[in-house]
Regions:
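Nudix hydrolase/Nudix homology domain
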Residues: 19-21, 58, 95-162, 388
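The catalytic Nudix box helix
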Residues: 45-46, 63-95
Length: 410
């Protein structure tokens, strides 16, 4: 039977109907559903379509879905298709942002959801010929190896790539995903106030920045924010350096007094905490260094943290810079935001970033010789944190590795 499907205009409004065969033959714009199914282990259900499908036969897919019928509510279509394709019923569906996709074979408005499911999966023989659970990382690794549905990769691939980068082994908080929300729960009581401070700081800060940042809201566990799409920066470019320069110029120009009032660690508190850290480094780390390194080490500890003039991210490295399609997709992890030295945010970019980044940064950020020198000092200080943490937690390998890096950078 040639079912009637709803046709949509460019704004996603129903504008008519047509037999499914006509919709396919003329590639008419319609509505379609897609549900990303995950289990409690975080794995995603992946399946292969049958050779008889009328579009993209025998391709791999990681969304359960189909066409919205004429007169059918899109949500009802989501529920129906999930049941028909995979035999999944009675689950809570988490709504994602709608999307649009078009190519030479199909054109539609996508109604996208995620759900959690640990029960059995029952394939519809006419639709699915194989299926299995895969970790997000393994699934992403197959994107270039297997022949996937291009629309699913375009619409839900960025979310899967983000899933693949998120782990719960953070020092300050554990993280887990629930649909399009990233939840964070403090691992220690002392961290909770800093997480909640982000719920005051980031809504004020986000509109002042040229790149996306998380805007958290409080939960019973800690905080949550909508997932920012992208993967941690691996390969640099001059263009990315320019974007980061524009971002840092905007960040360092915001009113520091207002930032502190809205939750950033104020200059006095940040300076006091840094003083404690530096004193502990003098007492615990310097004696572990060779005698010839004591004086330059003490001089370094005396120079850093002398300037506190701007709101800084305070932990800006590749793991906190998300990149999507060659552009900055987001700057994440603002727990350490404080009124501090802007050179701290330049440290990694000027001294350890991939090729091209520093040159691009210099095009959009005014880097003075004094600022460059201070950024180098912060770069030299970075391995001290690893040694300090290793001593605190009894991790001798971390201590040894950190001491070697301290000597290299001094």
């Amino acid at each position: 039977m040639d079912e009637l499907v709803a046709l949509l205009d460019s704004d996603g409004r129903v504008c008519g109907s047509a037999p499914r065969s006509v919709m396919r033959r003329e590639n008419l714009r319609h509505g379609a559903t897609g549900v990303l199914v995950r289990n409690s282990a975080g794995e995603i259900y992946v399946h292969r379509r049958t050779p008889t499908k009328d579009v993209y036969p025998h391709r791999y897919d990681f969304a359960a879905g189909g066409v919205v019928a004429a007169g059918e509510d899109p949500y009802d279509a989501v529920v129906r298709e999930l049941d028909e394709e995979l035999g999944i019923t009675g689950v809570e569906l988490s709504r994602l942002a709608e999307g649009d996709y078009a190519d030479d074979h199909t054109s539609y408005r996508a109604y996208l959801y995620t759900c959690a499911w640990d029960g059995p999966v029952k394939h519809q023989p006419e639709e699915v010929e194989w299926g299995a659970w895969m970790s997000p990382a393994d699934l992403v690794a197959k994107f270039d190896e297997w022949s996937f549905m291009p629309d699913t990769v375009a619409l839900l691939g960025p979310l899967v790539r983000t899933y693949a980068t998120i782990t719960d082994d953070g020092w300050d908080s554990r993280a887990w995903l629930d649909g399009e929300w990233l939840n964070r729960e403090p691992r220690r009581d002392a961290v909770r106030p800093r997480l909640l401070a982000e719920t005051r700081l980031m809504p004020w800060l986000a509109p002042q920045l040229p790149v996306p940042v998380p805007v958290p809201e409080p939960t019973q566990y800690g905080v949550r924010h909508r997932v920012l799409l992208g993967e941690p920066l691996e390969e640099g470019s001059t263009a990315l350096g320019r974007e980061l320069g524009e971002f840092l110029s905007a960040l360092h120009a915001v009113d520091p007094a207002e930032a502190a009032a809205r939750g950033a660690v104020d200059a006095a508190t940040a300076a006091a905490a840094k003083t404690v850290f530096l004193d502990e480094c003098r007492a615990q780390v310097v004696p572990l260094l060779p005698a010839h390194a004591h004086q330059p080490a003490l001089e370094l500890l005396g120079r850093v943290a002398a300037t506190r003039t701007a709101l800084v991210h305070a932990d800006l490295g590749s793991e906190h810079i998300l990149v999507q399609d060659g552009r900055i997709g987001g700057i994440i992890d603002w727990t350490d935001a404080e009124i501090g030295d802007p050179a701290l945010d330049l440290s990694w970019l000027l001294n350890d970033a991939p090729d091209g980044m520093a040159a691009g940064l210099a095009e959009t950020y005014d880097i003075t010789p004094v600022l460059r020198d201070r950024a180098l000092d912060w770069h030299r200080l970075a391995p001290w944190y690893g040694v300090h943490r290793g001593l605190l937690l009894g991790l001798p390998d971390d201590v040894e590795t950190g001491l070697t890096e301290i000597l290299t950078r001094l």
